[in-house]
Curated annotation (Swiss-Prot):
It comes from Xanthomonas campestris pv. campestris (strain ATCC 33913 / DSM 3586 / NCPPB 528 / LMG 568 / P 25). GO terms for biological process: adenine salvage; AMP salvage; purine ribonucleoside salvage. Gene3D superfamilies: 3.40.50.2020. Keywords: Cytoplasm, Glycosyltransferase, Purine salvage, Transferase. This is Adenine phosphoribosyltransferase. One of its GO terms (molecular function) is AMP binding.
Amino acid sequence: MNDCSRCAGSTSSGPAHWSGRIRDIADFPKPGIVFKDITPLLSDGPDFASALDEMAQPWRTTPLDAVLGIEARGFILGAALARELRTGFVPVRKPGKLPGRTLIQEYALEYGTDRIEMHEDALPRGARVLIVDDVLATGGTLRAALGLAAQLELEIVGAAVLVELLALQGRSKWLNDVPLLATLSY
């Protein structure tokens, strides 16, 4: 018999339990950064499923046309949430990764800038979208996704993140009148 507490058939007990599945990786991706690694949570089927259910719950009765999932781990969560919510999925990617014509949004990093993009014909004007990412840190990437959505004149119904790093105050870059929900906060 397989003795695997992380395998199918194990039980989870909610956010306090899921926090134990997220590990800190020091000095990644560069010195001085403590990276929140969600991959142990993703590799545990029951925990991943229950965390997704928790993320989806507030949006189940919200009319949506699509989930915008931010590269890279926002793809994993966003696509799974789109399926759970029975709606479409639109990838928001790093430059040069999407074929065809794209819209580009630049955003500030700690040292320099970066860009994200999405197809210019991804959704019709006025489509209702939920933005999904794995971690809310400084808020730059989420804010850039807002910029892309604004270029397409999409209606943002909210954002969902698995983890929010409170000390970095990324929430301050979000829209005050649009819900931003974090499943776990550190």
